[in-house]
Amino acid sequence: MTSSTTSSIVTRFAPSPTGFLHIGGARTALFNWLYARGRGGKMLLRIEDTDRERSTTAAIDAILDGLKWLELDWDGEVIYQYSRAARHREVAEQLLATGMAYRCYATAEELVAMREKARAEGRTRLYDGMWRDRDPKEAPEGVKPTIRLRAPLTGETMVEDQVQGRVVWQNENLDDLVLLRGDGNPTYMLAVVVDDHDMGVTHVIRGDDHLINAARQKQIYDALGWTVPSMSHIPLIHGPDGSKLSKRHGALGVDAYRAMGYLPSALRNYLVRLGWSHGDQEIFSTEEMIKAFDLPAIGRSAARFDFAKLENLNGHYIRHSDDAELVRQFEDVLNYVPNGAALKAKLNDATRAQLTQAMPSLKERAKTLLELIDGAAFIFADRPLPIDAKAAALLTPESRALIGRLHAALSAVEPWSGPATEAALRAFAEANNLKLGAVAQPLRAALTGRTTSPGIFDVLAILGRDESLGRLKDQAIA
């Protein structure tokens, strides 16, 4: 691809703010972003807020926050479709002036009767064109007209789709669609075409549930004499069983994945592989995605969402993340989880240092940030330590007596460090003719309240001398 073509690429992500940024929308945004970034182009963001009753500020904020969290930046200012209504009306009037549109005075009752008749006769064209060639002087009083496109009655409308291939519709099946409602508000179909044209969009990449819209919009482009942008309609995301994606399958907002402890880098990697492939490669850095992504490599069949695969991929990203970056992500996710505020209140320079020290071990056994938080709970626990059922079963009277002797042995360790406490524990086990595991298990239960944790020598080093000895004293029997 030459620089003369790549520099002019413009994609757009155009969500409707009637709900949060769902997982399918996030993938659409990612595909638009990758295609533009890989070709030195721009990705624009347009909020399609023409449905005034359902559009909410909260949904707009959630969409913007979701994109920022996924690190999908857009170029220029956010464009709000509703603010451009005057321009949309201007284009509708332009089509009237050229004879490519007409005023329709059909009443609501007449339209209902038309639809019922068409359905009874098995026709997909529901509007019968009653005002298409009728003299406006015959207009009934008190009826505010709509403006309809004078769509071709014969022939076919064709779109060369980069994913779906050549798609053809018979014009006899397509209505004279409404461009401007009786109240003067533009329809979605008109607004999208005008906005894409005025924004200089060269490539429309969206879900294949919009494929029928492509036929309608192509007719509007043709009526205006405008160049039709390249179209790519990507398959939807289905559940693991091939059915429509539901909430239990993963049809959640991006904010939910954030609150479940997924990393944005992992979610991006997972989403790019939903429907797109590049050989057998599964793990992609952002740079690799940008370089490799192309539209013809997107499959036509629906992708299947797999939570287990996402979780495993997230675990990979956690294990390979920088410890300091994981601490930052750890802090961030506390804003979105139950009891996160209480844990955040305990974060200070000392606990951050402990968390950073524990991270190499914690991240090896965590697939999500929530598991990371759970694994780090021993750092933030208050004395007396809460003991879970499995740990309590280990803390028998004999074990508590052993902990009392361990407390005495460890009290003599100076200076306190992982190697020093390890040497002391090994010496204690040998002197008492015990295996190290027999010492480590009750020790772990007393120090963390659990039966799983980072290595016991690491735990002692992370907690430090005073906290370690204090917790042992709480569980010991002298």
Swiss-Prot record:
Give the domain of life: Bacteria
A GO CC annotation given for this chain? cytosol
A molecular function GO annotation: glutamate-tRNA ligase activity
Q: What class of enzyme is it?
A: ligase
Chain positions of motif 'KMSKS' region: 244-248
> Which GO biological process entries does UniProt record here?
glutamyl-tRNA aminoacylation
Q: Which residues bind ATP?
A: K247
Entry-linked Pfam families: Anticodon_2, tRNA-synt_1c
User: What's the chief localization of this chain?
Assistant: cytoplasm
Q: Which UniProt keywords apply?
A: Aminoacyl-tRNA synthetase, ATP-binding, Cytoplasm, Ligase, Nucleotide-binding, Protein biosynthesis
> Which EC numbers characterise this protein's activity in its record?
6.1.1.17
The protein's assembly and partners: Monomer.
Q: What does this protein do?
A: Catalyzes the attachment of glutamate to tRNA(Glu) in a two-step reaction: glutamate is first activated by ATP to form Glu-AMP and then transferred to the acceptor end of tRNA(Glu).
Please report the name of this protein according to its UniProt entry.
Glutamate--tRNA ligase
Q: Which species is listed as the source?
A: Bradyrhizobium sp. (strain ORS 278)
